[in-house]
Amino acid sequence: MRHLLVTNDYPPKFGGIQNYLWELYRRLPADEVVVLTHPSPGWERWDKAQDHSIVRTRQPVLLPEPWLARQVQELVEAESIDLVMYDPAVPVGMLGPRLPAPYGVILHGAEVTVPGRIPGSRSVLGEVLRKSALVVTAGDYSTREAERAAGTKLPVAVIPPGVDCERFTPLPAGERAATRAQYGLSADDLVVLTLSRLVPRKGMDKLIDAAALLQHDY
């Protein structure tokens, strides 16, 4: 199956969603994938280093406007695309119900939670989701929020963010012990690691509060 990803968030533009998408798409068969996105600094060099096809628009941002609809449809026909994947579902995914090709959406968190709680945008998001042939979510939370906004069960595939195992590998026992000692931790001390931006919606404050409640137990 050949499919087209339409997104505003793709490397070399930096960010969590960009990294999530790239880690997915770089692992797919290169001859089955086309990515449509906007230009970002350094894109020429980046695109040359990738195995899969990347098409850059002349416009600086993708919006559900007639020019983008035309370009998506042209790529669908020229590349024999079977499925169009949109990220985010709103606003880019609003093209899905307007075009004849089957489509799906990719959901992470805030881009479904925020419009899903505002009456006007919730109805738009709900329509996009209900008409999707596939909904890819990064976890159970995104799935629940999507189905709440849609008001029904959805054809969901949960694909959590992965880890580049070639870049990030467990330390050997000796280095691990030395690193723990550097931070005043013994070999059997419990360690909870979270990696995130410190913004309210990500709930790091809740983790800190929970850790304080456990200080006498650990």
List each language-model region with its residue ranges.
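N-terminal subdomain of nucleotide-sugar transferases
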Residues: 1-42, 50-53, 130
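A short, histidine- and acid-enriched strand-loop-helix "catalytic/donor-clamping" loop
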Residues: 63, 93, 103-119, 131-134
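Short His-centered aromatic/hydrophobic patch
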Residues: 86-92
